Amino acid sequence: MNILGIETSCDETSGAVLCSGQVRSNVVSSQRCHAHFGGVVPELASREHERLIVSIVDAAVTEANITKNDLDVIAATAGPGLIGAVMVGLCFAQGMAYALQIPFVPVNHIEAHIFSPFIQEDPFHSSPEGAFVSLTVSGGHTLLSVVEPDLSYSVIGRTLDDAAGEAFDKTGKMLGLPYPAGPVIDKLAEKGDPAFHLFPRALTSKSQTSKNYLGNFDFSFSGLKTSVLTWLQKQSAEFIEHHKADIAASIQYAIVSVLVEKTIAAARSRGIKSVSIAGGVSANSALRRAMKEACKREGITLHVPGTVYSTDNAAMIATLAALKLSRGMKAECCYNIAPYASFAAGSRMA
């Protein structure tokens, strides 16, 4: 089965082709026009998707060494995301499916991230056999979920305010770093001391290390942003510039340590021995390293996506569509799917 995946939920325009469960192409174009504004401008994002989507899809099909007539199914992000951006990819995908008279599969962007760690040579043979705890962390979402083998899942924790990725970007902006600041902080922090300044770690407690922890798995990062801003305002420009790497490392520790502690506590409290991390922030080297070390101590198997699959991409859209179809979802020629902006967790991905 040949599946075309399309992703346009934010500021990446992507097309990918999956042939018999294997990724044959994954073309991604990241929009650079937003850097000047220090964040994604929704209207600009929509216009860029509209400008690029035809060439991106053509490139994905060509790279896969097939033609559009060889496609069996088309899948696209239906949400959550910037509503205008989602509409571009969704309408294009539905129109293309209608023209080719093939089924269309709408895909939830966050659910696709959850399964992105299993995009390998054969994603279905690398999927965990039992339940796993998924940390999905990006610029717009921070979710902790328990995923069952039948693809049913429940969200057990989420951010109450800002996502972890937003915390990276906004605190980085306070340090004068370019957008997106997350990767810059990651690189800068390699030269810094994470214990230079202890910023607050909200909604954490020593009780989370308990095997019987039954507390709150929610996250909060707005307080961290306020704390960083207040602390920086008390320092001189020379001090900040001289210790920029140390400050970046301290900010990164405050975010990463909370993500790791809550994920491990969730797995431990439920007796689950498999954990995955996904989303743009899963590319952070400190998060990968800390989660790997924590999982090793606990005897937990860690699933992490390749860095190319951490950020938004269409390969994860096509992969989840293929996984749904392999689990019995009926693909239909339905072209009236409406886009949606927010994430509402369902009980089953299929």
Swiss-Prot record:
Disulfide bonding pattern of the chain: none
Catalytic reaction(s) noted: L-threonylcarbamoyladenylate + adenosine(37) in tRNA = N(6)-L-threonylcarbamoyladenosine(37) in tRNA + AMP + H(+)
Broad EC category: transferase
Gene Ontology BP, a term: tRNA threonylcarbamoyladenosine modification
Localization in the cell: Cytoplasm
Gene3D superfamilies found in the cross-reference section: 3.30.420.40
Binding site for Fe cation: 109, 113, 312
Necessary cofactors: Fe(2+)
InterPro entries registered for this protein in UniProt: ATPase_NBD, Gcp-like_dom, KAE1/TsaD, TsaD
SUPFAM superfamilies given in the database record: Actin-like ATPase domain
Gene Ontology CC annotation, any one: cytoplasm
UniProt keyword annotation of Iron present: yes
Keyword entries, A-Z: Acyltransferase, Cytoplasm, Iron, Metal-binding, Transferase, tRNA processing
Residues that bind substrate: 136-140, 169, 182, 186, 284
Residue ranges of the TM segments: none
Gene Ontology MF: a single term: iron ion binding
EC number: 2.3.1.234
Function: Required for the formation of a threonylcarbamoyl group on adenosine at position 37 (t(6)A37) in tRNAs that read codons beginning with adenine. Is involved in the transfer of the threonylcarbamoyl moiety of threonylcarbamoyl-AMP (TC-AMP) to the N6 group of A37, together with TsaE and TsaB. TsaD likely plays a direct catalytic role in this reaction.
Family to which this protein belongs: Belongs to the KAE1 / TsaD family.
Protein name listed in UniProt: tRNA N6-adenosine threonylcarbamoyltransferase
Species the sequence originates in: Pelodictyon phaeoclathratiforme (strain DSM 5477 / BU-1)
Gene this protein is translated from: tsaD
